[in-house]
């Protein structure tokens, strides 16, 4: 992993310890230039199929082996929903129909050698149409999980916000049924 360099003087920068409120600064030790730790946008898709939700098992760090939803980082100039669809396709080979927004959830992502940085996670809900998921990209496995089993799986979720996302999806699915 390469170092993050100061845009002003080109030296490696350092992250400070979190201040009150969890704020982390990224400051150059040489020229004192301050870079802001802006959140990185991420997009994910909650896919429902006959009372089940699609969960993935992470194949890579961070949190390898834990349960996750299809999703990832938004690319430059990419629409949020398009990013969620792209990640779903890359990680499972699946396509879905109409998607509905589930909202935005904040979290942190750990990058080895650099530390934690904030993420802004946009989720969408869609119904499965056809095909079976084929784990690819950074997914080591894929499983259709009964909505009723999600509570006991919560300790295995990759991210703290996943429980809230799946609760919202479950509530919305029941309201639409």
Residue ranges and their predicted role:
Residues 37-39, 66, 114-120, 139:
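A generic structural micro-feature
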Residues 49, 70-76, 125, 163-164, ...:
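A short Gly-Trp-Pro
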Residues 48-90:
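Conserved Nudix-box catalytic region and its N-terminal flanking loop in Nudix hydrolases
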């Amino acid at each position: 992993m390469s170092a993050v360099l100061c845009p002003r003087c080109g030296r490696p920068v350092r992250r400070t310890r979190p201040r009150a409120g969890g704020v982390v600064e990224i400051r150059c030790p040489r020229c004192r230039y301050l870079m802001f730790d802006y959140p990185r946008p991420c997009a994910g898709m909650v896919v429902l199929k006959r009372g089940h939700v699609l969960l993935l098992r992470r194949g890579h760090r961070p949190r390898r082996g834990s349960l996750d939803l299809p999703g990832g980082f938004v690319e430059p100039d990419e629409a949020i929903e398009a990013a969620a669809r792209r990640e779903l396709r890359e990680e499972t080979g699946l396509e879905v129909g109409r998607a509905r927004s589930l909202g935005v959830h904040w979290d942190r992502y750990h990058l080895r050698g650099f530390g934690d940085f904030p993420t802004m996670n946009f989720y969408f809900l869609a119904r499965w149409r056809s095909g079976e998921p084929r784990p690819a990209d950074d997914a080591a496995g894929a499983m259709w999980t009964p909505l009723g089993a999600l509570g006991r799986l919560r300790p295995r979720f990759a991210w703290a916000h996943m429980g809230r996302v799946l609760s919202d999806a479950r509530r919305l699915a029941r309201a639409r049924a």
